[in-house]
Curated annotation (Swiss-Prot):
The entry's keywords: Antimicrobial, Bacteriolytic enzyme, Cytolysis, Host cell lysis by virus, Lyase, Viral release from host cell
EC number in record: 4.2.2.n1
GO molecular function: peptidoglycan lytic transglycosylase activity
UniProt KW Lyase keyword: yes
This protein's name: Endolysin gp144
Function: Endolysin with transglycosylase activity that degrades host peptidoglycans and participates in the sequential events which lead to the programmed host cell lysis releasing the mature viral particles. Binds and cleaves peptidoglycans found in Gram-negative bacteria and that contain the A1 chemotype peptidoglycan and fully N-acetylated glucosamine.
Catalytic site positions: 115
TM regions (residue ranges): none
Outcome of swapping residue 115 to A: 70% loss of enzymatic activity. Complete loss of activity
Organism: Pseudomonas phage phiKZ
Length: 260
């Protein structure tokens, strides 16, 4: 973990503040700013634990914080699937993840089926996408930074934990919740599984624009970058461009094929 000092800002400071709060040292709502209150609570924690009370969060302070931290929903309470590449074996995992996150297990099963056919060890040949939910390295790093401590995952510098189906499913659920929160106010309704898959596939920003563009507009005109990367989605076999509605119907059919 990074050495932190008063005046620092960023995700690591948020993690520090979260840990301090969980250990009983009240810094208020984590804001990512290492200010006076955070400094004072760090010093207090260090004094209480016989550490150098200089307010600098180095290796020893991080280690002591982590040793005292007990996550509310540790990922190890989620069962491992009894087999790989199996929807039936994945179902108890997703049911437990639903209980932990509030995201419907049916939705999680649909996405894992589309992305990896329930192969939690799979890695894409053309990108860094890995595991049940095919997380890219950068996205995974962000998810672990934002949600890892909630489930007892403190760090994963190599991204190896993407192949742990329990953690992949938990992070997949948290990403789905993020996308729900982005799409809901724009759509003024609950997003469907197809809406959410669009956000997963194209990114939430592009999905938001896609879902608010006229149905008869040519999709490639509005999304040239996505069309270039995914020509079979945006163009018919004869080369003619598809409309927004036609692309949506295609994606909806893909999602429907994995609903059970």
């Amino acid at each position: 973990m990074k050495v932190l000092r008063k005046g620092d800002r960023g995700d690591e400071v948020c993690q520090l503040q979260t840990l301090l709060n969980l250990c009983g040292y009240d810094v208020g709502k984590p804001d990512g700013i290492f200010g006076n209150n955070t400094f004072n609570q760090v010093v207090k924690f260090q004094k209480d634990n016989c550490l150098d009370s200089d307010g600098i969060v180095g290796k020893n302070t991080w280690a002591e914080l982590f040793s005292k931290y007990s996550p509310p929903i540790p990922y190890k309470t989620i069962p491992m699937p009894t087999a790989n590449k199996s929807r039936a074996a994945a179902t108890p995992v997703m049911n437990a993840v639903e209980n932990a996150t509030g995201v419907r297990s049916q939705l999680l099963l649909t996405f894992a089926s589309i992305e990896s056919a329930f192969d939690y060890e799979i890695k894409a040949k053309t990108s860094s996408a890995t595991g049940w939910f095919q997380f890219l390295t950068g996205t995974w790093k962000t998810m672990i930074e934002n949600y890892g401590m909630k489930y007892g995952v403190l760090t994963d510098p190599t991204g190896a934990l993407r192949k742990d189906p329990r953690i992949s499913a938990l992070m997949g659920a948290e990403l789905i919740k993020e996308n729900m929160n982005i799409l809901r106010p724009v759509l003024k309704r609950e997003p469907t599984d197809t809406d959410l898959y669009l956000a997963h596939f194209f990114g939430p920003g592009a999905a938001r624009r896609f879902l608010t563009t006229g149905q008869n507009e040519l999709a490639a005109t509005h999304f040239p970058k996505e069309a270039q990367a995914n020509p079979s989605i945006f163009y018919n076999k004869d080369g003619s461009p598809k409309t927004i509605q036609e692309v949506y119907n295609l994606m909806d059919g893909k999602v429907a094929a994995h609903r059970k």
